[in-house]
């Protein structure tokens, strides 16, 4: 199976929508995976209908994981809860803490909110827009909420990997599963814990074939044990991140 993957399309931004509208992507996969930050869920409608018609027509399934930005605009994370799916076309939809079996492959899909340790709490809660743009059960998102969601997502991923009877396993998250894929110029950032959680020990001892991530707006691939860690983020077109980070609309992995 060929799995074409990308993330951080940010269709809520005019420049990004325009870029995608006028640059039709090649079809290189059987399945398309979108690893978060695609559009605002609060609108309850997918923007750029032409793009979704194209995606629906060209892939067996289009699997989307919600990113942190998908909840922006003071959307309440718990409106949908911690486990949900939403298909807005027959074969296109969002999946939060869900497993989708396609042929002999289990796709384990989760935002995987990161873990923020106490020493980082002040810097992250004051330096990350998530805590100003997102609600949780009617109140502004807190670090405790973030960590609670992280633990739920991580427990779900670990349980799903352990229970899988599929021949192949692909994990899809928005947040980074290891600091090995944090860009060198961000390694000393005070808010790194809002982006990556070190799961290397779990990954190396697992039978995960590939892990697709987004969020960081830097595309760094790695291998941990036998697991390929891959990303393909468009990022902010108005900052030319699609150029500086080497976004490849046709990037795929074969499982």
Which positions does each model-derived feature cover?
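Beta-strand-turn-beta hairpins that frame and shape the catalytic cleft
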Residues: 1-4, 99-109, 168, 223-228
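A short helix->loop->beta-strand "cap" motif at the edges of active sites that frequently abuts
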Residues: 57-61, 166-167, 208-209, 226-227
